């Protein structure tokens, strides 16, 4: 994906407020050997771009001052209750250096799995994204996870999925093989009393006062 940015000279609260009032969003680009660069982006174009999953998880082409450079979206600040982007951060990408990025997981085939189709279980995604390490050219927009063979009583772990070529998982917290998807059994129906079973004895009637 690509987007257009413009150089921004002024900074500070007042300058940023005036910029937002004119339909622009202040931002910054940092990283690499170059100095941090103040930028501004058209708010409407940015707002629509942020609705796309790929804008958050892909290497982006940023057009700035007649040049195109590779960047990653690193931070977005939203207004608490208005549909307004207050500030945005991008990081420059070195094509020869590995990067760390969270990539969305796309789950497919759950309805065809024995767990769902036969045993009427529910599939519960424990994780919706995966932290990975790879070269910029190998960064996938998403990772497809096939659930068609998932069975009742089984969970899908990190080592059960096939990652794209050149992509390695980044595991933190001591869990080398975390659960990505769990299977939830169906809620057991309340069993009706067997036909012919003795009915419970009625409670004794209370005696009235004399």
Curated annotation (Swiss-Prot):
GO BP: translation
Top-level lineage group: Bacteria
Presence of keyword rRNA-binding: yes
Pfam families for the chain: Ribosomal_L25p, Ribosomal_TL5_C
UniProt keyword RNA-binding present: yes
Keywords recorded for this protein, A-Z: Ribonucleoprotein, Ribosomal protein, RNA-binding, rRNA-binding
Gene Ontology CC: cytosolic large ribosomal subunit
Biased composition (Low complexity): 191-200
Region (Disordered): 191-210
GO molecular function, one term: structural constituent of ribosome
Quaternary structure, from the entry: Part of the 50S ribosomal subunit; part of the 5S rRNA/L5/L18/L25 subcomplex. Contacts the 5S rRNA. Binds to the 5S rRNA independently of L5 and L18.
Assigned protein family: Belongs to the bacterial ribosomal protein bL25 family. CTC subfamily.
Function in brief: This is one of the proteins that binds to the 5S RNA in the ribosome where it forms part of the central protuberance.
NCBIfam families: bL25_bact_ctc, PRK05618.1-2, PRK05618.1-5, PRK05943.1
Name the UniProt record assigns to this protein: Large ribosomal subunit protein bL25
